[in-house]
A protein has these predicted regions:
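Residue-level signature of catalytic and energy-coupling elements of molecular machines
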Residues: 18, 77, 99, 135
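Conserved phosphate-binding/catalytic loops in two-lobed NTP-binding clefts
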Residues: 111-137, 145, 152
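Acidic, glycine/GT-rich loop-and beta-edge segments that sit at the periphery of enzyme/chaperone cores
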Residues: 8-16, 137-157
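Glycine-rich phosphate-binding loops at beta-strand->alpha-helix junctions
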Residues: 23, 89-113
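Active-site lining segments that contact anionic ligands and/or coordinate catalytic metals
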Residues: 37, 94-95, 118
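Active-site phosphate-binding and catalytic loops of NTP-dependent enzymes
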Residues: 6-12, 28, 81-89, 145-149
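Phosphate-binding glycine-rich/basic clefts of nucleotide- and phosphate-handling proteins
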Residues: 1-67
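Phosphate/ATP-binding catalytic cores across multiple sugar-kinase/actin-like superfamilies
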Residues: 65-92, 138-141
Length: 157
C-alpha cells in the first residue's frame, strides 16, 4: 500500500509498527480516536529518488489499506460458518467467536466480524500465547484428532 500510494519502500518492522500503532479495519468513533493516535511518522526509501523519505501515515490510510484483507478474513469466517453443522452454528451463535493470534489484535477486526456475521466476537485473553498453547495441546492429542477427522463427514467435504 505504501509503495503503491506514496512511491516509498518500507521494511517489515516499519509495516508492523504501522499495523500495531494505527492499523484499523473498522470505522473509528470519536472516543476511539482519543485512545489511539491519528497518525504515525515513518521513514522509508523513495522509489523515485532512491533517497530516504519521511511520511506521515494516517489511521484513515491504514483503514483503506486493510479493507481488502479484512473482508477476505470476514469471507473466510462466513465460509467456515456455512460448512459448519447446524447444531454447532447454534452454539457459536449463542456463545460467540473468540479470536486468537496476532492478527486478532488488528484494531476493530472483532467489531467487523461481529457486524458482518451478526455473531458476538471477542479477542482472547493473552491471544498470542493461546495459539502456542493450543498447538501444543493439539500435538499431544494428535491421534485423537486424526481419528475424529477421518470419521467426520464434514471434514471430508
Amino acid at each position: 500500500y505504501i509503495r503503491k500510494k506514496h512511491n516509498v519502500l518500507i521494511g517489515e518492522r516499519t509495516a508492523e509498527q504501522l499495523k500495531i500503532s494505527i492499523g484499523c479495519v473498522y470505522e473509528r468513533t470519536e472516543e476511539d480516536k482519543k485512545i489511539r493516535p491519528e497518525s504515525v511518522e515513518i521513514r522509508g526509501r523513495s522509489l523515485v529518488s532512491g533517497l530516504p523519505k519521511t511520511l506521515t501515515i494516517t489511521a484513515d490510510e491504514m483503514f483503506e489499506a486493510f479493507e481488502e484483507p479484512a473482508y477476505s478474513i470476514v469471507d473466510a469466517v462466513k465460509a467456515v460458518l456455512e460448512k459448519t453443522p447446524p447444531e454447532l452454528v447454534g452454539d457459536i451463535s449463542e456463545k460467540g467467536i473468540v479470536m486468537t493470534g496476532g492478527g486478532s489484535l488488528v484494531w476493530g477486526l472483532d467489531r467487523l466480524i461481529a457486524c458482518e456475521t451478526g455473531i458476538h466476537c471477542e479477542v482472547a485473553d493473552d491471544t498470542i500465547s493461546c495459539v502456542a498453547i493450543g498447538t501444543g495441546k493439539s500435538l499431544d492429542m494428535l491421534d485423537i484428532l486424526m481419528d475424529g477427522s477421518a470419521r467426520n463427514k464434514y471434514y471430508k467435504q
